[in-house]
Amino acid sequence: MMRISRTPDPYVYPALTALRASGKFILGALSNTVAFPPGIRDDHGVLFGSELLHPPNAPYANDGTVIADRFDVFISSAHIGLRKPDPKIYELAVRELDAEARRQGLGGVNVGDVLFLDDIGANLKSAKSVGMRTLKVDLGKTEAAVRELEELTGVKLLEGVQDRARL
């Protein structure tokens, strides 16, 4: 299971790359994480780490492997002592996104500016309760979620992805 969670989704990963390249958005990740002790191995016996495991034939196989580098803001619950769906973690995320937007000279970020994506209803409900907009990403249906994200952002996110995702 740990190996699967480190393999980039064939629709979401290119969408993140396209959103970042557009220069129109501050990208943040809010992840319920675990800090594993040293020496833990995944289901294939590979020493576990936090790096991404790109499939060798993926068009993004030569991208960096540090997931946090794909975002402007990366909040790991294991490192801050809060977990989703605690409203405080969403409030922290808005403060961090706002600070990053200001650092980049993009003005500020208000809670209503944030579009929060998740697959768990309780996390979405909590995000909505603090004022964020939400988008449910159903497991196994990431292409549909990325299509909706494409409509919401006005950025082409699936162009050329369908063929590569089926490799």
Where are these regions (language model features)?
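Asp-based, Mg2+/Mn2+-dependent phosphohydrolase catalytic module
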Residues: 17, 30, 34-167
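Short, acidic loop-to-helix structural element flanking the phosphoryl-transfer center
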Residues: 1-31, 39
